[in-house]
Amino acid sequence: MPELPEVETTRAGIRPHIKGKTLTDFHVRQKSLRWPVELPNTIKGEMVNEVERRGKYLLLRMAPGCLIIHLGMSGSLRIVQGSAAPSQHDHLDLAFDDLSLRLNDPRRFGSVHFHRGTPETHWLLHK
């Protein structure tokens, strides 16, 4: 399972590539991760204002809300240039103009949620 240092390294690695970029599309190849992935089409055209971490969750803040990503036991995020073909365990692409943020999760224990409002009010982050 990615521990806090790995999650922070992931955040720091993806932030310069996607902060300030507009999400043009997303493609969910495998809806059955830890919980079903259901992203609203309304996030297309929204800009990623910030990339943060709360515990082991990565937060992609947008004007209408926040994408909350957990890498599970074996998940990873990577920046993919152009239209690189997905591998077997690439379950989600968040597409921007010139690149994609790709979630790879062989064991499918990761999760991706969209939450309107502040992420601290989402049931996964609420204390």
Question: Where are the regions a protein language model picked out?
Answer:
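Phosphate/anion-contacting hairpin/loop surfaces
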Residues: L67-K127
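Extended, highly charged segments
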Residues: M1-M62, A95-D97
